């Protein structure tokens, strides 16, 4: 029974790879990492990441490779494991380095900014703008006071 499960997983892997080549990775990332119930469980994160890396390499598809890096980073980010944030940032930085013009690189940049600047206990970045009456407004002018920031617009 154990060998049959291994063979079944290998067959599933081959089917997933065939599907990935046909669809450029759409839906494959979750399936390999075991997040999609319909696949009957995954391979575990380490093996799934290795398979994703190999898939990105052999496919030659830049979009798929960018998706793999972003998926790995997101998986680390949400895992809650010790040191996972460092691993996530490494993947986001790699994505930005290899695919600087990809839309996921922009998202990665935002994730890194949030991790480095928007955490509990950190000083709030200054916000400069106009109030409803057109007067200059700086968040730093209200340091030490309770402030409510309400963003609104007509879009």
Language model features with spans:
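Active-site substrate-binding loop specific to GH73 endo-beta-N-acetylglucosaminidase modules
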Residues: 52
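TPR/Sel1-like alpha-solenoid repeat signature
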Residues: 69-72, 91
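Short active-site neighborhood of thiol/selenol oxidoreductases, capturing the structured segment around
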Residues: 137-155
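N-proximal helix/coil linker or "cap" segments that precede and/or mark the start of modular domains
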Residues: 78, 86-132, 140-143
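Short solvent-exposed coil/turn linkers within tandem alpha-helical repeat scaffolds
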Residues: 1-11, 15-27, 35-46, 55-66, ...
